[in-house]
């Protein structure tokens, strides 16, 4: 595929805001986390003084690995859980949470959707809560093994329906994101897309809802990557036209709609690609546009 060329004119790009899974992590490197070319590009961007911003649906554990892998702590910030939490200079400068009672209500409301294999809660706790009661015992065991075989992409978790409920009810727990997962492979992705419209119809007035591969993500209403990124850029005194945003999935659409220098991965769903200006075969192809 031939890449389209755009000109940024006289605009100086001072920040790169990138998604992780499917973007910076494409192609996957199960043991090294990031490909050599992508890692070097990010490192060089940071060393040149650009603000590198990891904008992800993940919590803080894996972004922390990225910072360690790149070996540069300066000029790297994190927008986690699709905009629910912003970390700058090692401190939380902004967050939006789902009230605990509201999250518990959603937990029970989702029980009727038998297509859900696991239900995950991303919180301020080190380990995410995972209710896998939608799986039979054999598949639950296979899923547990699968989670532990993710290599560099592994995130700490604790299994159990009752444990998840107790975690939600704990007033010390801050809930950033709730994520139903629909299974492995193409079937899981197709199921998530089919259920997505039902979720938006039933829960869309109370939640920000996005699809991401075989999962659907719920954040509190009004929470999104673009809103959080703007908060961070304001703190960094960077204009919105001085940032390049890169992503590949539904939760990146707010970035593409709010920032003019937008880049999307070529393997993204067509409806996502239509929202961005430039398509990239690989993340490090960004070097063709940003010096």
Label every model-predicted segment:
Residues 1-18, 37, 47, 238:
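Non-catalytic pre-domain segments flanking phosphatase-related domains
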